From Swiss-Prot:
Pfam families: YbeY
Cofactor names: Zn(2+)
Chain's gene name: ybeY
Family note: Belongs to the endoribonuclease YbeY family.
Domain of life, source organism: Bacteria
EC code(s) of this entry: 3.1.-.-
Compartments, record wording: Cytoplasm
Protein's name in the database: Endoribonuclease YbeY
NCBIfam families: rRNA maturation RNase YbeY
Signal peptide (residue range): none
Source species: Neisseria gonorrhoeae (strain ATCC 700825 / FA 1090)
Length: 171
């Protein structure tokens, strides 16, 4: 019997990045776990040697509670990012490893995709990349920071085979 080839780069990638994925949402039409892994890894791979990210899909009520409790905004949002590395939480010797959590609300994502004329897959890809960039320290509060973050999102989306997420015509 023939043995399957082992590809060392895939083994190395799995050692470098772990995605703890949980779908606690009742929404239909959600991409596969491997897609979320691929999108998050595309953002991480050039800047972080190692990362452990929890990604949970929550229904609107729970997503709203997190947004209210942590951001003071009483509505469900599309994605929330919680970076463990912010501040002085971890000792310096492990700071090259990124730890964080993403919460995505599929109902909000699906509604936004329909309103914006995007495919659900494309919008999930964008928001996974967007949330991962937040974990990495990117932000969009100030205009100059927003330009940098949006440029990186556009680059990563195009590299993944998707159009510019900020253009209505999708090009």
């Amino acid at each position: 019997m023939k043995r399957a080839k082992k590809y060392p780069f895939l083994t190395l990638q799995r050692q470098r990045f772990h995605l703890n994925f949980e779908n606690a949402s009742s929404a239909a039409g959600i991409p596969a776990e491997r897609d979320f892994y691929r999108w998050a890894w595309s953002a991480l791979k050039n800047e972080y040697l190692r990362a452990d990210i929890g990604l949970i899909l929550l229904d609107e009520e729970e997503a709203r509670a997190y947004n209210r409790d942590y951001r003071g905004k009483d509505y469900a949002t599309n994605v929330l990012s919680f970076a463990l590395n912010e501040g002085e939480i971890l000792p310096c010797q492990v700071s090259e490893r990124l730890y964080g959590d993403l919460i995505i609300c599929p109902q909000v994502v699906l509604k936004e995709a329909a309103e914006q004329g995007k495919t659900p897959e494309r919008h999930f890809a964008h928001l996974t990349i967007h949330g991962t960039l937040h974990l990495m320290g990117y932000d969009h509060i100030k205009d100059d920071e927003a330009e940098i973050m949006e440029a990186e999102e556009i680059r990563l989306m195009r590299a993944a085979g998707y159009p510019n997420p900020y253009r209505e015509d999708g090009h």
